[in-house]
Amino acid sequence: VLPALLEYISAYPDIHINCVFVDRVVNLLEEGIDAGIRIGELPDSSMRALRVGKVNQVICGSPAYLNAKGIPRTPNDLEKHTLIRSAGVSPTHSWRFSEGITIKIKPRLVINSNDSVVSALKAGLGLGRLISYQVAPELADGSLKKVLSSYEPSHMPVHIIHREGRSG
């Protein structure tokens, strides 16, 4: 998001932006925010939405963790693993997979910061599910490895939402 935002304010020098980055869903009206980015299907609301892309979720862990605990071959294998969950955006106790598979998870660690989840995964504390861009550098440098790729759920839409009467 930040690179696009920097490009935008460079192109429009009279625009002033107060940017808030948080790992949770905010109420734009209550918090006085003009626009936000939402990942996933949108509930009905009074907000206007513009679809701008799509992302996918991945489950990953460190090579050291996978060497010690083994690589899960199916979603059901996750019950034998230590799981780390991000609390911010998706406070759910179930993970959905392709082919309509849903499993209940019992995370050992729940963290409200995606960056901290990445740190815990790199430290070898367990497996976690994040959005692919949140772990792209770690997947590229090999400090994290994806598992259960063939079970990844469908891509999730990305929207810019804003209050009625506001435009970007």
Predicted feature residues:
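Secondary-structure boundary/capping motif
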Residues: 1, 28, 69-70, 168
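A bilobed periplasmic-binding-protein/Venus flytrap-type ligand-binding module shared by bacterial periplasmic
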Residues: 158-168
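Conserved amphipathic alpha-helical interaction elements at protein-protein interfaces in regulatory
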Residues: 11-14, 141, 166
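Solvent-exposed beta-strand sheet faces enriched in polar/charged residues
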Residues: 18-22, 147, 161
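C-terminal regulatory
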Residues: 27, 42-155
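Central regulatory/effector-binding core of bacterial HTH transcription factors
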Residues: 1-45
